[in-house]
Amino acid sequence: ACIQGMQNGEIAAAVLEDQYAMPFVSDGTITYIRSLTYDDDFKVEPCCILAFNSDFAKENPVHVKRYTRAFQKAGVFIEQNTEQALDILLQNSWASGDRDDDLALMQAFDYTITEQRTKDSLLDIIADYQKYGVIDSEQSADEVLAKVWAPVLDDVQ
């Protein structure tokens, strides 16, 4: 509905996920203004963070570590074998769309985000949220971080 709304002049802009917007950007229907995928100031930011319920993490530390390690190894594989990874996704119907667009999007991501970069990004987000009043600014960023994040692995690729 957002795309049609922009085409009809009913809305001027929309916030869309890059994966959703890409086909419309590729065919010239829309132009992106800012992108978490392509803008230089976002390129070192993790797009996603693997999260576990704190009770589950406390009760299953081995599972959490193994899952996180597997997730990290998968990221390294994708980074080093992007086309093969995309083929696996497409063959199993875990991805859909135009192969060239999918490949361009996958090549734009950094799948080897370290714990340190994750920590730095979370501290930036906490500072922004405190600045805008989304979360309490009485606590230090490190205190807030300690409540929401616990690194599982060392920075080993």
Locate the predicted segments by residue.
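A local structural motif
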Residues: 1, 5-12, 97, 135-141
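Pocket-lining segment of extracytoplasmic ligand-binding domains
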Residues: 2-91
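Short loop/turn and capping residues at structural boundaries
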Residues: 17, 35-36, 100-101, 140-141
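Short secondary-structure boundary/hinge segments and terminal tails
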Residues: 23-24, 41-43, 107-110, 145-149
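Alpha-helix boundary/capping detector
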Residues: 32, 37, 93, 97, ...
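Glycine-rich, flexible loop/turn motifs
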Residues: 46, 52, 107, 131, ...
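Secondary-structure end/capping motifs
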Residues: 58-136
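Conserved C-terminal helix/tail region of periplasmic/extracytoplasmic solute-binding proteins
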Residues: 127-157
